[in-house]
Amino acid sequence: MGKHRGKKYLEVAKLVEIGKLYDIREALELVQKTKTAKFTETVEVALRLGVDPRHADQQIRGTVVLPHGTGKTVKILAITSGENIEKALAAGADYAGAEEYINQIQQGWLDFDLVIATPDMMPKIGRLGKILGTKGLMPNPKSGTVTPDIAAAVSEFKKGKLAFRVDKLGSIHAPIGKVDFDLDKIEENFKAFMDQIIRLKPASSKGQYLRTVAVSLTMGPGVKMDPAIVGKIVG
């Protein structure tokens, strides 16, 4: 069954030429023109990569510091103990502690966007695997969310550090700013993100690595970029 689209969506969708692959600047400029929502929409990137996540060496995940942040306020839970609790809170964590939060999560509490933990807490957090894992919230050293320097990690993520991972279909979705950002800032964020994606290309990845690259607003139509152009300009 087709998804019902509102009148405003259908109007802005006409701005996007079907089948066309846009260059970076052109696509981002067009995306800003597709705003229809009353709230400040997020500019999102959707990638389809030439990887097979069933192979461990092709499970792409990592972090990138977007030069201008995502524009989103990230609610952070720091799972740690002792003096690190105060350090995490001072760095901007919304919640910090250990057993009390682990117990709350087991009871269904999920009022946070990101979990950062010190390594000593991981055996305890292990029992939250089914809850956090399915939502992509499980702390992991590769995504910079398991670290002894929890204060620095909290500070970086609050400033705009972005964690990403490929899903089982070989896709990655990530926010790169808000629609009301200056176009140059969105472009710089996009390039920083793509630079990291390209650097993480597995040696075992066969054929075309960047299969599709598209950008859109939260409620808007997708605008496809030319993967060949993205691959040349960035990296």
UniProtKB/Swiss-Prot annotation:
What keywords are assigned to this protein? Repressor, Ribonucleoprotein, Ribosomal protein, RNA-binding, rRNA-binding, Translation regulation, tRNA-binding
Q: Which SUPFAM superfamilies match?
A: Ribosomal protein L1
List the Gene Ontology MF annotations in alphabetical order: rRNA binding; structural constituent of ribosome; tRNA binding
Gene3D superfamilies linked to this entry: 3.30.190.20, 3.40.50.790
Q: Pfam families, per this entry? A: Ribosomal_L1
Which domain of life, per UniProt? Bacteria
Keyword tRNA-binding found: yes
* InterPro entries from the UniProt entry: Ribosom_uL1_bac-type, Ribosomal_uL1, Ribosomal_uL1-like, Ribosomal_uL1/biogenesis, Ribosomal_uL1_3-a/b-sand, Ribosomal_uL1_CS
Biological processes annotated in GO: regulation of translation; translation
Record field: transmembrane: none
Q: What's an example GO cellular component term for this entry? A: large ribosomal subunit
Q: How does it assemble?
A: Part of the 50S ribosomal subunit.
Question: So what does this one do?
Answer: Binds directly to 23S rRNA. The L1 stalk is quite mobile in the ribosome, and is involved in E site tRNA release.
Family to which the UniProt record says this protein belongs: Belongs to the universal ribosomal protein uL1 family.
Q: What is this protein called?
A: Large ribosomal subunit protein uL1
Its source organism is Fusobacterium nucleatum subsp. nucleatum (strain ATCC 25586 / DSM 15643 / BCRC 10681 / CIP 101130 / JCM 8532 / KCTC 2640 / LMG 13131 / VPI 4355)
